[in-house]
């Protein structure tokens, strides 16, 4: 690979090396970096902060803060601080002593390359290790074409540049304008999805087996986010192409590269990228803000956590689309029928994706008369989790150890009981990324659908008219929401109960308890008021409420939004709202349903 490189070094405010323009071949024979191999250690993040922390320009002051150091509050920047990670590592160390180095390799790269890869608790790390997946790791990564992506087998540049420093690698070549005050190398690899795949395909030491216990000849894929993208339409060059960075590091126009140029009003003509690296783990970011933010250890400013939370909200808002076809009216004597729901995955990977333990997405369907819930499926019960009704529609991947059928033990898992997560558009067949179970059917082009369609039906019931003298409020409010929870109460309790090594699991349980009840993330929502017929009139002298023997007959008011005819009303447009922060069974499906 021949790259264009310019570098200069400033020490003590004096320019000691002029800008150098030349051809730079880069390191040869790249291979995964192992503990103790680096001659030139990773520079601490605080050094990067000196130049790369700056406010938005006056023209963009009303936009989310774009400084790259806001990365610190992302889950990438918090990967080594994540208390759920360390609680899981402790249990993994019980299950497979000596095999947790790969966990540290991904979540705490500085600890790994520094020889602290045997750590099983956050207390065993050095302060600089806590910066997680940080500036120097990404900006010194070099492409290793021989090693397959995955399992954090990163190759870190350790070759000094012309200025006596290991160059920082990035997509700007500085043929025009002021170059940075550190060595740099123009390298497009940092903008490719394969770089993200370094850590976002993960296998364990177990071999995967099928439902009968027979080996499938491949390692157990704990997560395959990169492979999901690679097999989707998003990875194909063309109008639908999107890299990981396009979604998780959105482009911004007219941005400075450092604080000095920002203060001088200089901008980089080709713009830059946000470094928010947004995912969906909002509750964890809230927890980390309490522990490490301004009111806690003051390791990361609250303003950066606020940037991270806002970025998560925007990411969730674009993740999925709901389409609902509802009946024109509901007759309580007949029940709620013909409620059809379609969920479309707009992301470039399964929805949800990544680490699957303790994570579930589902549909909540509610039919209310006033404040009374008449029909429901997928209700979340505080402190317990999902109610578990027969029509509950979930999207999750559940793994177990085949021999014992024990769940949640990451390094013992070797088979998938189910993987009902929604595939990305155009996902090709492949053992490593196929759904597990009978939820989805291949489309005509032999790809998996990026949607799930399901129909709900509820039987007739009796409800007393709260205002028999007023037919204007004889209305049922129908609502459908796509909800998501990471770290379910069941999983958090598992982390606390199963840990015999240290108190990391109990600490996690206490931290989450301090946040209060779990509020599921809302990825998409739909609602519509329809006329309600068949309400029971209370007998004279009785109070309103559930119908009983004293009710004397139905009322037939039209209600708000009434319409004639009994056919379904398509309601997939204006009332579908985007995300706000804050069982495998189902009825009939079509296309992607089942």
Regions found by a protein language model. Give the residues of each.
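Cleavable N-terminal signal peptides
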Residues: 16-18, 28
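Primarily the internal scaffold of c-type cytochrome electron-transfer domains
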Residues: 31-32, 55-89, 119-450, 454-468, ...
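Bacterial N-terminal signal peptides that target proteins for export
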Residues: 2-16
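Conserved, well-structured interaction surfaces
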Residues: 100, 105-117
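Residues immediately within or flanking Cys/His clusters that coordinate Zn2+
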Residues: 41-46, 96, 100, 132, ...
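Ser/Thr-rich, Pro/Gly/Ala-heavy low-complexity intrinsically disordered linkers and tails
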Residues: 28-30, 536-594
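N-terminal module-boundary/linker segments of secreted carbohydrate-active enzymes
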Residues: 30-61
């Amino acid at each position: 690979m021949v790259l264009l490189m310019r570098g200069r070094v400033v020490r003590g405010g004096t320019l000691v090396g002029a800008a150098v323009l030349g051809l730079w071949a880069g390191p040869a024979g790249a291979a995964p970096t192992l503990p103790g191999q680096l001659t030139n250690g990773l520079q601490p993040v605080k050094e990067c902060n000196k130049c790369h922390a700056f406010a938005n320009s006056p023209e963009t002051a009303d936009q989310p803060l774009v400084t790259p150091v806001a990365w610190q509050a992302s889950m990438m920047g918090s990967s080594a601080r994540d208390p759920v990670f360390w609680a899981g590592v402790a249990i993994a160390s019980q299950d497979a002593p000596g095999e947790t180095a790969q966990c540290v390799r991904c979540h705490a790269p500085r600890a790994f390359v520094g020889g602290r890869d045997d750590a099983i608790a956050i207390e065993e790390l050095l302060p600089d290790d806590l910066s997680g997946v940080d500036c120097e790791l990404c900006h010194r990564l070099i492409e290793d074409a021989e090693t397959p992506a995955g399992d954090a087998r990163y190759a870190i540049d350790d070759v000094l540049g012309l200025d006596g420093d290991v160059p920082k690698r990035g997509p700007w070549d500085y043929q025009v304008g002021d170059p940075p005050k550190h060595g740099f190398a123009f390298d497009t690899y940092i903008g490719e999805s394969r770089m993200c795949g370094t850590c976002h395909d993960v296998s364990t030491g177990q071999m995967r087996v099928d439902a009968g216990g027979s080996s499938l000849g491949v390692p157990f894929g704990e997560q395959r986010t990169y492979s999901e993208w690679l097999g989707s339409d998003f990875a194909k060059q063309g109008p639908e192409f999107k890299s990981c960075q396009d979604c998780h590091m959105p482009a911004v126009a007219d941005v400075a590269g450092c604080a000095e140029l920002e203060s001088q009003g200089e901008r980089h003509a080709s713009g830059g990228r946000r470094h928010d690296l947004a995912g969906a783990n909002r509750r964890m970011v809230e927890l980390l803000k309490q522990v490490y933010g301004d009111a806690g250890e003051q390791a990361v400013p609250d303003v950066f956590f606020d940037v991270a939370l806002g970025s998560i909200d925007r990411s969730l808002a674009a993740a999925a689309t709901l389409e609902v076809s509802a009946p024109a009216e509901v007759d309580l004597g007949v029940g709620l029928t013909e409620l059809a729901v379609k969920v479309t995955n707009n992301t470039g990977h399964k929805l949800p994706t990544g680490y699957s333990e303790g994570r579930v997405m589902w549909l909540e369907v509610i039919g209310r008369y006033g404040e009374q819930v008449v029909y429901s499926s997928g209700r979340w019960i505080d402190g317990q989790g999902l109610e578990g009704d027969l029509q509950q529609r979930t999207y999750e991947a559940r793994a177990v150890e085949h021999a014992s059928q024990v769940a949640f033990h990451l390094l013992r898992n070797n088979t998938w009981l189910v993987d009902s997560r929604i595939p990305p558009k155009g996902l090709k067949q492949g053992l490593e990324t196929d759904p597990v179970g009978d939820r989805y059917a291949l489309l005509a082009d032999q790809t998996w659908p990026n949607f799930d369609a399901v129909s709900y039906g509820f039987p007739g019931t009796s409800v007393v008219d709260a205002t028999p003298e007023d037919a204007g409020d004889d209305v049922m409010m129908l609502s459908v929401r796509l909800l998501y929870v990471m770290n379910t109460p069941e999983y958090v309790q598992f982390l606390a109960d199963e840990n015999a090594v240290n108190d990391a699991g109990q600490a996690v349980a206490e931290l989450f308890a301090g946040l209060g009840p779990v509020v599921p993330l809302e990825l998409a929502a739909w609602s519509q008021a329809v006329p309600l017929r068949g309400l029971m009139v209370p007998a004279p002298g009785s109070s309103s409420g559930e119908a009983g023997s004293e009710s004397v007959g139905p009322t037939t008011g039209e209600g708000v939004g009434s319409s004639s005819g009994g056919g379904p009303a398509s309601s997939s447009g204006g009332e579908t709202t985007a995300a706000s922060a804050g069982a495998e069974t189902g009825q009939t499906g079509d296309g992607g349903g089942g």
